[in-house]
């Protein structure tokens, strides 16, 4: 069984080829989280797009809970976590923006994102098993190279921030969908967690469908089968 489950804010759980991947695992301080931290026992890979607290989240504690889990982020961010929080180097999957990294039957890649980040460049994350490809854009504004991300990785699903202020708003995210051209659906994330990023997600859904693409609006805790 393969699925995408939204855990509120930018936290997303992906089950693919027998692996359990969690991206940007903000759980404890996430008012929309439908789960407690112990739900993440048994994860295979923890992906982090950048070092802002609402994306770095509970990564250190999750890695301690799961000694066999691997961290996937830019090497600079990984080494910050090694030096600052004593994350074991054995738990790292070193990478930077570029091509796929093969890991136990799945493929992982980092992409460009336009945002800020103190210890490393911000990124998006691509997860694929060769049959299904998911693109999590991280925190980002709209940028023209999204066309290249779509061309190179050809994602089936695009998870895009729509909350505005710190990232794209719904209107800009619709433009992003038209550049990325997801083969199956676009899914909005990073909205309505707090008042500062409160928007109407139906604006995104309608805009995406008007462009001829599918949009799936998940509630926190909801999942879709891939």
From Swiss-Prot:
InterPro entries with a match to the protein in the record: Metallo-B-lactamas, RibonucZ/Hydroxyglut_hydro, UPF0173, UPF0173_UPF0282_UlaG_hydrolase
UniProt GO molecular function: hydrolase activity
Alphabetical list of SMART domains matching this protein: Lactamase_B (SM00849)
Keywords, comma-separated and alphabetical: Hydrolase
Listed HAMAP family: UPF0173
NCBIfam families according to UniProt: PRK00685.1 (NF001911)
Family: Belongs to the UPF0173 family.
PANTHER family: UPF0173 METAL-DEPENDENT HYDROLASE MJ1163, UPF0173 METAL-DEPENDENT HYDROLASE MJ1163-RELATED
Protein name listed in UniProt: UPF0173 metal-dependent hydrolase Msed_2125
Protein species of origin: Metallosphaera sedula (strain ATCC 51363 / DSM 5348 / JCM 9185 / NBRC 15509 / TH2)
